[in-house]
């Protein structure tokens, strides 16, 4: 009964966050940081009756202005993630993250993670140096496709963009429409031909719910049927076919979406 998390919590080490754990019998030593401690996390998952978890971190939101230091931060975090993933690989997978503001470094880090045995990586589209339809990303799509390492994308916004104010409904409106902000990324990947050129490229759109997905796919198909093809990015299939072959969408508590799919 009840939940083991508190949506009003303001941090993983705050008393407000830790109280729900302790109330449900999870043993937490003083100073424990549950998301960063795999043993505590597994205990939490057992209490919640969750078998496995794919975990997104927030590396992209860390404000590091020096590029070389930033790259070191990403490498250190990703090395840590791969260590965590050895503890119980059937149940915990902490996604290594790519520094998408720096495409060349992004490619290097993807290559390093593939060599380290990563099953998937996080690709945040909100902080990219160039839009995902730009040619600068072609080497990344090719590498991920060849290695068959999925790129995982989470809903959100630009790291340096603050939430709208909690005033006159602005923040609630932003949060209410957050699941839809991956629709543009999906459409750009389809229409730039990334999936056409790289048939084994897999992209997972995470925690975005799925109620919008059938409409978005149908509307993308209609563009192909009603508009002149773009000669710079020819497609041999409908967007709905690329969606089925190359994409996945995860959700929670989406009754409408489950009925439509």
Predicted region positions:
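Helix-coil boundary/capping segments in enzymes
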Residues: 1-261
């Amino acid at each position: 009964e009840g939940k083991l998390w508190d949506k009003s919590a303001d941090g993983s080490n705050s008393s407000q966050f830790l109280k729900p754990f302790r109330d449900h019998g999870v043993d937490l030593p003083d100073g424990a940081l549950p998301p960063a401690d795999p043993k505590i996390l597994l205990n939490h998952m057992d209490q919640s009756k969750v078998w496995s978890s794919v975990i997104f971190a927030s590396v992209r939101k860390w404000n590091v202005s020096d590029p070389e230091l930033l790259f070191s931060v990403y490498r250190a975090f990703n090395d840590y993630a791969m260590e965590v993933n050895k503890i119980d690989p059937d149940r915990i997978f902490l996604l290594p993250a790519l520094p998408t503001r720096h495409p060349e470094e992004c490619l290097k880090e993807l290559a390093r993670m593939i060599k380290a045995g990563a099953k998937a990586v996080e690709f945040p589209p909100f902080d990219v140096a160039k839009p995902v339809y730009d040619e600068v990303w072609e080497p990344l799509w090719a590498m991920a496709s060849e290695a068959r390492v999925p790129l995982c994308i989470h809903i959100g916004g630009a790291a340096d963009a603050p939430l709208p104010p909690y005033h006159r409904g602005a923040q609630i409106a932003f949060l209410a429409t957050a699941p839809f902000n991956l629709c543009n990324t999906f459409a750009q990947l389809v229409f730039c031909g990334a999936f056409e050129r790289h048939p084994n490229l897999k992209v997972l759109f995470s925690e975005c719910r799925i109620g919008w997905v059938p409409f978005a796919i149908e509307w993308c198909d209609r563009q192909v049927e009603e508009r002149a093809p773009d000669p710079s990015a020819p497609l041999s299939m409908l967007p709905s076919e690329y969606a089925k072959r190359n994409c996945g969408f995860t959700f929670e508590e989406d009754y409408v979406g489950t009925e439509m799919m």
